[in-house]
Every structure is written in structure tokens, then in C-alpha cells.
Curated annotation (Swiss-Prot):
E.C. numbers: 2.5.1.16
Residues holding spermidine: 64, 88, 158-161
Record-level GO cellular component terms: cytosol
Binding-site residues for S-methyl-5'-thioadenosine, renumbered to this chain: 33, 108, 140-141, 165
Subcellular localization: Cytoplasm
Alphabetized HAMAP family for the sequence: Spermidine_synth (MF_00198)
The protein, known as: Polyamine aminopropyltransferase
Main location: cytoplasm
Name of encoding gene: speE
Source lineage: Bacteria, Pseudomonadati, Pseudomonadota, Gammaproteobacteria, Enterobacterales
Organism: Salmonella paratyphi B (strain ATCC BAA-1250 / SPB7)
Length: 286
């Protein structure tokens, strides 16, 4: 792709978003995905896989703070965390901010994503790959959760959309494997698309997760470059109380963790679980 051209996202056929490409930093088709990273004056460095925006320097903090701090602070004493995907390192960066976490395992299917992001998205990983608690496993996420002997307190599925390599991370086999390696009272979260445009994705995840967890729901955040509205995150656990903790408990845990965030705060934590009526209606109808 030439510089000073427009890059158009291909996630939707009838509409979408575009970015002016000021400078192409990297573009290569790996064994699994077509990766590109370019610079844009408004959003900084932009990474896309198979024609779909995955992250930008400008707004990535919203996604990663909400995917990390909501489950970790709701759990309250997570020691062992599993990240599925997350090769850009930003999810890892946020998990490492929790000093009580003892081990962080990241399973990424494509080693090329990790090496590429270490070089071209240094602000995302911010040196977190060098944290002594971190272990990188190059493997398919479904295979890992169904074969590992490790168990975890929190599992974060930082998956792509359910097409191509990311499709397997929306299957019953994956969700069953996650339940298998979650400790009692553990929490599973996953990105679940923009529900206004991808409602079937949320409904499908809810239906499948409900076979394995007693408390299944969603929480949300507004992320500008995930086009089409509010981003939805799946939530699943067998400890029904964790989704309904008081603001005082979350505030105390947030203060004890010493976190300084740009988007997440205890009030956002509670409000994020309030869902639009159209999603409630769709969930009730299935």
C-alpha cells in the first residue's frame, strides 16, 4: 500500500470507516493473517489484521483497561491469569499493573504478530514482555485450554472477530476448555463485537457460554475505532456474586491496587454492566 492513500476497513459490506495512510511501517501476509501497521495523524499507529482494525495508539487504552481491570478487580485475588491472543502486548501491559498476580500466560497462535508488535507497537506493550511473571505460548487457543494442566483465576480472550483464525475462539469447544482450566470462582471475559451491528455474535456467545457457566452476561465500553457503537464484552463465571459487587468493594480494591487509569474507574465498572434494551430483548427472545 502506498503512502498518502486511504485504507478502508472491510468488516462490513455496505458501510465502514477509512484512515488516511501517512506512512506504512509494516505490511506482510503471514501463515495465518494479513498484517499491516501504518501511521495516521489522528490515531497514531494503526494495526489491522485481514482488513479489520485491531488497535490504534489513540484509543487502545479503553479496550485494554476494560478487558483487564473489570475481571481482575471483580475477582479480587487473582493470582494466575491467562490471555488468549493479545499479541500486541497491551493486555499484558495492563495485567502486569496488578502486583498480586503471580503468573501471566499468553497464548498466541501467530509468533509473527508478537515479534511485529514488539518492534512496531512499543507503546502498547511498554516493556511488559520482559516481566518475569510472563510466559508466551505459541499455540492454538482451543488446543491450549483443552490440553493444559495449568489452572487460572481469570481468562481474557483477546480474540479477533469470528472469521478466519479467530473463529475457533467463539466455539463451544473453546468455552468448555476455558471452564475446564478456570479455578473455582474464576472469571472468563472476551471481546464480543459491536452489538448494534453484530448482535448475532453476542447471542451466540451467550447461548454457548450458558452451557458451562451459571452467570453469563455482558459489559460495554465506547471505543471510537471499533466502528458502529458500543463495544460488547462477554462475561462468564460460576460465582454469581462477582458481577454485583458494591461500588465500595470495587473502590477499595481499585485504591489498594494503586491503579491510575485513563478510562476505567469504579463508577465505570458498575455502569458498564447496564445494557441497552434491544440487547435485553434479544437475549430474552432466544
Amino acid at each position: 500500500m502506498a503512502e498518502n492513500t486511504m485504507w478502508h476497513e472491510t468488516l462490513h459490506d455496505q458501510f465502514g470507516q477509512y484512515f488516511a495512510v501517512d506512512n506504512v511501517l509494516y505490511h506482510e501476509k503471514t501463515d495465518h493473517q494479513d498484517l499491516i501497521i501504518f501511521e495516521n495523524a489522528a490515531f497514531g499507529r494503526v494495526m489491522a489484521l485481514d482488513g479489520v482494525v485491531q488497535t490504534t495508539e489513540r484509543d487502545e487504552f479503553i479496550y485494554h483497561e476494560m478487558m483487564t481491570h473489570v475481571p481482575l478487580l471483580a475477582h479480587g485475588h487473582a493470582k494466575h491469569v491467562l490471555i488468549i491472543g493479545g499479541g500486541d502486548g497491551a493486555m499484558l501491559r495492563e495485567v502486569t499493573r496488578h502486583k498480586n498476580v503471580e503468573t501471566i500466560t499468553m497464548v498466541e497462535i501467530d509468533a509473527g504478530v508478537v515479534s511485529f508488535c514488539r518492534q512496531y507497537l512499543p507503546n502498547h506493550n511498554a516493556g511488559s514482555y520482559d516481566d518475569p511473571r510472563f510466559t508466551l505460548v505459541i499455540d492454538d487457543g482451543v488446543n491450549f485450554v483443552n490440553q493444559t494442566h495449568q489452572t487460572f483465576d481469570v481468562i481474557i480472550s483477546d480474540c479477533t472477530d469470528p472469521i478466519g483464525p479467530g473463529e475457533s475462539l467463539f466455539t463451544s469447544a473453546f468455552y468448555e476448555g476455558c471452564k475446564r482450566c478456570l479455578n473455582p470462582g474464576g472469571i472468563f471475559v472476551a471481546q464480543n463485537g459491536v452489538c448494534f451491528l453484530q448482535q448475532d455474535e453476542a447471542l451466540d456467545s451467550h447461548r454457548k457460554l450458558s452451557h458451562y457457566f451459571s452467570d453469563v452476561g455482558f459489559y460495554q465500553a465506547a471505543i471510537p475505532t471499533y466502528y458502529g457503537g458500543i463495544m460488547t464484552f462477554a462475561w462468564a463465571t460460576n460465582n454469581d456474586a462477582l458481577r454485583h459487587l458494591s461500588s465500595e468493594i470495587i473502590q477499595a480494591r481499585f485504591h489498594a491496587a494503586g491503579l491510575k487509569c485513563r478510562y476505567y474507574n469504579p463508577a465505570i465498572h458498575a455502569a458498564a454492566f447496564a445494557l441497552p434494551q434491544y440487547l435485553h430483548d434479544a437475549l430474552s427472545a432466544q
